[in-house]
């Protein structure tokens, strides 16, 4: 991006007043990448990877391919119980630059195809990445 870009917003799910925090990506004044970017995701893309996915999808040079993310991107709220146990509750609601919330659904790519398949999923993943780099996908 040449200028700051709004990429996502977040707010605490249990807040009585919905006060969103808007997040922007601001380009560096030193060096920046402005070329095409292909983002590959799968159901193994989860949590911070999904927040990163939302941020990259807001940039005009990003093409999102692969399979939908897992759909588990909320921050947690820790609560200690009287017996000393700790319970972690999903607490943060994220929405992308278009206002979409992907929690529980996963972020779908614009071009869908399996990323990990067959008897050797790591090899099929490597072959897929090779095809993308070589322009065959």
Where would I find each of the regions flagged by the language model?
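Gly/Ser/Thr-rich loop/hinge elements
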Residues: 1-36, 40, 44, 74-78, ...
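Extracytoplasmic/secreted envelope proteins and their assembly/folding machinery
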Residues: 34-37, 49-53, 119-130
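Short, well-structured beta-strand/strand-turn elements
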Residues: 44-46, 59-73
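Short, solvent-exposed amphipathic alpha-helical segments in soluble enzyme
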Residues: 53-59, 80
